[in-house]
Regions:
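Short, acidic, small-residue-rich periplasmic hinge/interaction motif at the N-terminus
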Residues: 7-51
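Short acidic/polar hinge/loop motifs at secondary-structure boundaries
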Residues: 100-127
Length: 431
């Protein structure tokens, strides 16, 4: 800094030079998305799973660590499970993948076989579910958020564990920075014999002439699942912050070992499924005017599952059988039961920020599920072609007071359901 006295017609020329200042460090403080969710108005746990993505644990085991959440699995890899949130379970809990119903990926895709290395965090809502998810869940929801990094990466994991269990996960992304175009392939494969030993099973002892309890190995519980997905899109354009198209295919094969109770043993019955899905998503901030954000989703799924029960046999835990005149599962005639369930999902969401502390959100979700049932060999089975369509409209007002120390959400939802049922037989007979 220098002071110069200019008098009269004296002419002075000034040349400015850049003065660079070197800083030791720059600290930027802010709250992560997970922390913001935990401090919001909803009862929600946000799990950061980055440290667990390349372990042998599946998502159901990771979610089971959360307070108030309990998962009970019926067996090993690929077995059915029941998730409860604060005591609520079953259909009162819904599952989402980036805000899209997980069912849209197909009936074979669950928490048990979704590849962990595509996940950024998991949001677990306990009780009240935000209107923007567009669901009729009463007990809570699990929303799985995938990795949205705008950079190139490659993540490959392979694990081998007990009972001939193999898991392979591949996740990659290539981004062309100049154009904003990206491609993200995902591939996952899981297989297991699930031939672990079960204690206290009832078997007939010929020498003693009575039933005794022994430890036996499971012999008909193989599991195989495959998931392949390709996502292609573009980011940071004038007409869209993000637009992408996703195509996926999934397949599962599951042998059935037991019925509702452990003493009922199967040796031939199995369940299969395969599904194809195509979807498109669109996001744009400041859509028409400033502070109006919009995102949309459109998805269609071809879902097919089949239960094969054609053996007239009765098995025991010694892997021996006697011939009978009934199948294993229902005790009826031979059956190859097919279920074709096409699903259409469409969602539109508008979010408008009135200011830094007040915002309004409007959400519409359309979810249509078909259910066509038929049997290849059981001629007495009554075919059906049922339809369930849901329209869910949600309006919410978000309020932030006292410098973020108090958060309020006021919302209302409207449910419009359409149901067409042609089924004529009892559900316990037809499935």
């Amino acid at each position: 800094e220098q002071e110069i006295d200019v008098r009269g017609d004296r002419r002075l020329n000034f040349t400015l030079k850049e003065d660079a200042v070197t800083l030791e460090s720059v600290h930027v403080y802010g709250k992560s998305k997970s922390q913001q969710l935990r401090e919001g108005a909803y009862a929600v746990n946000a799990l950061n799973v980055k440290s667990l993505i390349n372990t042998s644990q599946n998502l159901s085991a990771i979610v089971n660590r959360t307070t108030g959440v309990k998962i009970r699995e019926e067996g090993g890899l690929g077995s059915d499970f029941n998730l409860s949130i604060n005591g609520m379970s079953g259909n009162s809990i819904r599952y989402f993948l980036d805000g899209m119903p997980l069912d849209a990926k197909g009936s074979g895709v669950t928490l048990a076989n979704l590849p962990p290395n595509i996940i950024d965090r998991i949001e677990i809502y306990k009780g009240v579910v935000p209107a923007h998810l567009g669901t009729d869940a009463l007990g809570g929801a699990v929303n799985i958020i995938t990795n949205q990094q705008n950079k190139n990466f490659l993540d490959v994991a392979y694990s081998v564990s007990s009972f001939h269990t193999h898991q392979f996960n591949f996740n990659a992304q290539y981004v062309e920075q100049k154009t904003g175009i990206f491609i993200k392939p995902v591939f996952s494969l899981n297989s297991s014999k699930n031939d672990y030993k079960v204690k206290n099973v009832e078997v007939w002892n010929e020498s003693k002439g009575k039933y005794v309890y022994e430890e036996k190995k499971r012999f008909h519980d193989d599991y195989f699942s495959l998931l392949g997905q390709v996502e292609i899109g573009v980011t940071n354009k004038k007409w869209a912050d993000a637009f992408c198209v996703t195509a996926s295919y999934s397949k599962t094969d599951k042998e059935l070992q037991t019925g509702a109770i452990q003493s009922i043993v199967y040796g031939e019955a199995e369940r299969k499924s395969d599904s194809k899905n195509i979807s498109a998503t669109y996001r744009k901030r400041n859509l028409i005017f400033e502070h109006l954000n919009f995102n949309a989703l459109l998805s269609y799924t071809w879902d097919h599952s089949c239960t094969v029960d054609t053996a007239f046999r009765k098995y025991n835990w010694n892997n021996k059988y006697i011939n009978t005149t009934r199948n294993e599962i229902t005790g009826d005639s031979k059956s190859i039961r097919h279920y074709k369930r096409p699903r259409t999902v469409a969602r539109a969401n508008f979010d408008y920020a009135l200011n830094d502390n007040h915002s309004i959100n409007v959400n519409y979700l359309f979810n249509r599920l078909g259910n066509k049932r038929y049997d290849d060999v059981d001629k007495t089975f009554s075919k059906s072609n049922d339809v369930l369509a849901k329209h869910i409209i949600g309006l919410s007002y978000n309020q932030r007071l006292l410098d973020g120390k108090m958060n309020n959400v006021f919302f209302v939802k409207d449910y419009i359901n359409y149901l067409m049922v042609t089924q004529k037989d009892e559900s316990w007979i037809s499935g």
